[in-house]
Amino acid sequence: MKLNDIKRLYKIVRVFLSYGIDEILPHNKYTRSIRCWRMLFFWLKNKHKNKAFGLCLRLALQELGPVWIKLGQMLSTRRDLFPAEIADELALLQDNVEAFSGKIARQQIEQALGSSLENWFTDFDENALASASIAQVHTAKLKLGEEQEKEVVIKVLRPNIQPQIEADLSWMYKLAGLLPKLFREGYRLRAVEVIQEYEKTLRDELDLRVEMANAIKLRENFLDSPMLYIPKMYEAFCHKNVIVMERIYGIPVSDVETLQRNGTDMKLLAERGVQVFFTQVFRDSFFHADMHPGNIFVNPHYPENPQYIGIDCGIVGKLNESDKRYLAESFVAFFNRDYRRVAQMHVDAGWTPQDTNIDDFEQAFREVCEPIFAKPLSEISFAQVLLNLFNVAREFNMQVQPQLVLLQKTLLYIEGLGRQLYPQLDLWDTAKPFLQNWLNEQIGMKVTFKKLKAKLPYLQEHLPDFPETLMDALKQQKFISQQLVEINKKLAKQQRWQKKMFVLIVGIVIFSVTLWQFAALPLAISAGLFLVGFLVWLIGFLLP
């Protein structure tokens, strides 16, 4: 262990102890070592005894720095793991950190481009436009030739961030591995899986080319759409630690007052947020999974026909056809209060084990979800529905589905945003036609022919081999059948032998007990028992 690792460990321990994070753990033999840490560092007192645990956890993560802040932000969306009061506190974590020097940013850009910044850009502002834990952005103008320029923003990765991330991830894995041993509920949290999911997201953010590729795909999916605009990426200037994109001007989606002053159709804007989300999920199978208010703006030029502008495409979610179908059918079944169908969908999708008891599963869904319908449909939260479904499924050993976790997080953002813009938004009324139409399209002849067409190249390649493959399969089947016959013969022989041995042993036991008690028993009874024992033994001996 290096000196820097020891220093980092001490800081983590110091922060956790000073905020009393250890005090939530139960007193048992597994937590004895943690209590020893508390005694060893006797000078690190809990300075926040009167504060709620959620607040202390948020403040501790805030003090530990960017990597822990981002972990807390991710955990705030995992309401299937944490009580609402803790998740709400973690949602308040801010990713704003002090910007690094503009001169260092310039050096990073020039190193990536392989030439002086002035060869490609003018008006480069060394003061960062915005700064976050992983990267910061600067404004400039890109030279397009013939005295033309285009306003752009340049996103630059923080220098030397990799070693800190590696060190923090290492300690996160160690802590996650300890949790199941420290308290009973630790197994339910599946902490190691959570850190694995977080690591994947974090590593994607460390390669800005991933964000570039995501933005290009989203832009293509919504090209010329009145609902969503994604800024253009300038691929020739994009590298692992630097990307260049079109600069946009818009009204922050959270600035409701400015949107209203601009004459924005708030009802249509809220409905379009829902439509954009479901279009990404069910049409494209590819959705922006970081749609919090800081990443969404509204085009100010079309208030009567409002258009969203999305930035920061570093985190995206992907769903396969199976996930989409099961998810859509589960939603429709839920709102039809068909809980057996919901339960069956989870099993058929492979989200829960195949041996799950459907009757128990259905009843669990009914008990948790039925109270939701005490509210009008317009007030039911889609995100809460999804959360309830996941919570029940986890009790039946549902494995963590990262794509569904991202979906639930994004839906939470979209729903909250929609109701902030237009409190009367009926999410189900907006989404149901979309889901129903999509499901109807999946069972039509057009889709069937489309799927067959997609399989044609595979069929053309493998059809000539089909007779040979079929013969091999038949031979294999014959061989397997012969093997099964042999196995059955051996099993039958073994069962006969076991039966024979049992009868022989019973006969010997009767004979032995009679011999042992011969003096204590009347002669007639002893003779009778000898005869019975001999006959039982003889039957066993004569058995095949």
Swiss-Prot record:
<dbReference type="GO" id="GO:0010795">
    <property type="term" value="P:regulation of ubiquinone biosynthetic process"/>
</dbReference>
<dbReference type="InterPro" id="IPR045308">
    <property type="entry name" value="UbiB_bact"/>
</dbReference>
<keyword id="KW-0997">Cell inner membrane</keyword>
<dbReference type="InterPro" id="IPR050154">
    <property type="entry name" value="UbiB_kinase"/>
</dbReference>
<dbReference type="Pfam" id="PF03109">
    <property type="entry name" value="ABC1"/>
</dbReference>
<dbReference type="InterPro" id="IPR004147">
    <property type="entry name" value="ABC1_dom"/>
</dbReference>
<feature type="binding site">
    <location>
        <position position="155"/>
    </location>
    <ligand>
        <name>ATP</name>
    </ligand>
</feature>
<protein>
    <recommendedName>
        <fullName>Probable protein kinase UbiB</fullName>
        <ecNumber>2.7.-.-</ecNumber>
    </recommendedName>
</protein>
<keyword id="KW-0067">ATP-binding</keyword>
<keyword id="KW-0831">Ubiquinone biosynthesis</keyword>
<keyword id="KW-0418">Kinase</keyword>
<feature type="binding site">
    <location>
        <begin position="129"/>
        <end position="137"/>
    </location>
    <ligand>
        <name>ATP</name>
    </ligand>
</feature>
<feature type="active site" description="Proton acceptor">
    <location>
        <position position="290"/>
    </location>
</feature>
<keyword id="KW-0547">Nucleotide-binding</keyword>
<keyword id="KW-1003">Cell membrane</keyword>
<dbReference type="GO" id="GO:0005524">
    <property type="term" value="F:ATP binding"/>
</dbReference>
<dbReference type="GO" id="GO:0006744">
    <property type="term" value="P:ubiquinone biosynthetic process"/>
</dbReference>
<comment type="function">
    <text>Is probably a protein kinase regulator of UbiI activity which is involved in aerobic coenzyme Q (ubiquinone) biosynthesis.</text>
</comment>
<dbReference type="GO" id="GO:0004672">
    <property type="term" value="F:protein kinase activity"/>
</dbReference>
<dbReference type="InterPro" id="IPR011009">
    <property type="entry name" value="Kinase-like_dom_sf"/>
</dbReference>
<dbReference type="InterPro" id="IPR010232">
    <property type="entry name" value="UbiB"/>
</dbReference>
<feature type="transmembrane region" description="Helical">
    <location>
        <begin position="523"/>
        <end position="543"/>
    </location>
</feature>
<comment type="pathway">
    <text>Cofactor biosynthesis; ubiquinone biosynthesis [regulation].</text>
</comment>
<feature type="transmembrane region" description="Helical">
    <location>
        <begin position="501"/>
        <end position="521"/>
    </location>
</feature>
<dbReference type="GO" id="GO:0005886">
    <property type="term" value="C:plasma membrane"/>
</dbReference>
<comment type="similarity">
    <text>Belongs to the ABC1 family. UbiB subfamily.</text>
</comment>
<keyword id="KW-0472">Membrane</keyword>
<keyword id="KW-0808">Transferase</keyword>
<keyword id="KW-1133">Transmembrane helix</keyword>
<feature type="domain" description="Protein kinase">
    <location>
        <begin position="123"/>
        <end position="504"/>
    </location>
</feature>
<keyword id="KW-0812">Transmembrane</keyword>
